[in-house]
């Protein structure tokens, strides 16, 4: 998952240390797997920023059950692998981390993650897609923490009944766009969001094989479906239905401001926006993404956050037990109640706590039309070229086919240069 998506909604918080054990204020030992003075084992767990409260009770229970002291440190989850590269080798890294699944392929290639081998009953408790996200070359490297995908937000004060088709939103936008105000807006100059149109039209990143792996020689970002989707995207920009200010890396801030200032009636975002939009005083509704002109549902990327064991851990077996414990049904439910991160636990996906929560239910429905963001190392070569192509399309500086053809050539060239065996 692209890291910059997360830094835009709130100020970046410095590393916050939350001690959920006997580590006192004067304890400056930040390394994992170090024995305490009493001989009790310790685990260092890196949790996402502002999410430690969701595991506090589970941590205390695990400490009692296993006579272990656990230290929880909050770090931005998309940055933890980068920190592990340095801290792990230095002997000060964590035993357990949380991370986006599309970083797993590279992390495994670098030898940063430990394979885990939970009972099949544990594996079967999660949705198939979420387990697939943690699997590389047939081996499991983590257990799912939560799933997320993009959904449609609309301002109830500006839209009484949300259209269910993208053409319907196009028509509404034609009526509402004037005097610096807009109807529906989306960050379609980035593949993370544009995939909703390209994927629903038949485009794809890499062709997926029957075993779940990806054929990096089959890139579908310039096929007929992708080109059709790109032309549809270009229409919203060329007709002025999307403001130019949303184009570029800082455009997400403009997009969010339009919605929170009631200058946009609707937009595409994800679960990370539930809190900020509520805090901004917006009375919003949430629904799965609308259907495309071809009658198919808009697609989206399915992202999975996970708990993973560091290969540098000196207590790998205990760390794996903690990962299993923290992701079980009971603790996943408690974590959802605190953080609203949706756990891909099969039983919970049918639980009223999810189905009767409007926000969570919208995400759950959209996951049916979502595809996993590829977790293979070659995915790292995709983001910049295709985003550059989409920005050329958004600004009208080139036609769709040429932009996508050039992007695919660059992606293919970079894969051959950086990932050839």
Cite the ranges covered by each PLM segment.
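Long, aromatic- and glycine/proline-rich binding clefts that accommodate carbohydrate-like moieties
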Residues: 287, 336-392, 416-420
